Amino acid sequence: MRFAPNRLLTSVALAVVMAGGVTTVTTATASATPRVNVCGSSYTYLESFPIRSGTGTTVGDIDLYWSAQSERNCAVARPVNGLTPHWIAVEISTPSGGYASDGLSENYTQYAGPVSVYAPGCVSVFGSMGYGGPYGYGQGDANNVAC
């Protein structure tokens, strides 16, 4: 299981509770989960696609990378805004049938992936994560990107 506790978020929440009178904390005040290239040194970051909850709140990102050396795209799904999901999954595919996934039967809480496919053309990516409370389930995708 991949897990990194967010002590800053815990400290902020504790401070708010101790201050009294404030009953809600928005995710916008929490620090973003950093994007880290776990695909490898030959991969270059291309772009990110949001993973949103049913209420439209962005709860994660799917980061897409490219390696010109191997002609492969790589995807990683990660939470944002200091949130910690119960699970994370990521998938990547090509129009020609290339496919890879990670986290579908796991309980990752920091990130899912890296997953990569040989893709001299376009790829599609899908990411999802499960939360308790108000966020429930989040998903996001991007079709025919990095062409």
Could you describe each region identified by the protein language model?
Residues M1-T44:
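N-terminal prepro-regions of secreted/extracellular proteins
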Residues S31-C147:
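Post-signal peptide N-terminal regions of Sec-secreted extracellular proteins
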